[in-house]
A protein has these predicted regions:
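Glycine-rich portal/gate segments that line the openings of hydrophobic small-molecule binding cavities
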Residues: 70-77, 84, 100-173, 186-202, ...
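Active-site cradle of extracellular carbohydrate-active enzymes
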Residues: 179
Length: 231
């Protein structure tokens, strides 16, 4: 069983579930697992027979300015995204916790799960070590993944929070960090909303790089939740 991040002080962040339909409300997240900003991506457009289709929808291109623990500032390309999965929260939460859903099988050369994580690098649930790129310009890096139920119970979650970030690797990749929040769709507990934020500053990257990665990992979470094999 993978460890959960210990619950510390709670951070509140106003989140909007559906722009134009609902107001802001403060949501408490475990310290360090909260999203950086209010998610501004639109929801998937409902249809006559589907309140939230299984597609991912992105915000406009953004730039994020953050602060490192040592006080140094940084900038990174940023995108927000929202999508739905036609499975209840407990099923989607189980899928999210599978380390293999974080693998971009379209771009990595190798992907290794480190569980338990290296304690001097990661205080989370597990790490992934990745080699990506095309030879001879490949990069190696490790990500730390932290996940927790923010509201509800482990086997009956109402809100979950996941954060991942680069903790070791190539200096050609100064910033790589992401956030995933999951919650039930309003009035449709059989459908789960997933909300992403992703920051990337790399030598050869763009907002399209982020768009491609989030499309892949959303698809892997969705397929895992539906019991489909992952490539």
């Amino acid at each position: 069983m993978r460890r959960l991040v210990k619950l510390g002080a709670l951070a509140s962040l106003p989140l909007v579930a559906f722009a134009g339909c609902y107001g802001n409300e403060a949501t408490a997240f475990p310290q360090g697992l909260e999203p950086w900003e209010e998610n501004v991506a639109p929801m998937p457009e409902p249809t006559a027979d589907d309140p939230c289709p299984e597609v991912i929808v992105f915000s406009e291109n953004r730039t994020f300015t953050g602060m490192r623990p040592d006080g140094r500032g940084y900038e990174a390309n940023s995108l927000h995204a929202r999508a739905c999965i036609h499975q209840p929260m407990d099923v989607v939460w189980e899928a999210i916790r599978d380390p293999q859903v974080g693998k971009d099988h379209t771009s990595v050369n190798s992907f290794t799960v480190i569980d338990p994580p290296m304690p001097d690098e990661c205080d989370g649930d597990y790490q992934t070590q990745i080699n990506a790129g095309t030879a001879p310009f490949t990069v190696d890096f490790r990500l730390c993944w932290r996940q927790q139920v923010a509201e509800g119970l482990e086997d009956a979650p109402l809100l979950t929070a996941t954060r991942w970030q680069k903790v070791w690797g190539s200096s050609a990749l100064p910033v790589l960090e992401g956030s995933l929040v999951s919650r039930p769709l309003e009035d449709h507990p059989e459908i789960t909303v997933v909300e992403y934020q992703y920051h990337l500053n790399a030598l050869t990257s763009s907002h399209q790089t982020i768009r491609d990665y989030l499309t892949v990992i959303y698809g892997r979470v969705r397929d895992r939740a539906h019991g489909r094999p992952l490539p």
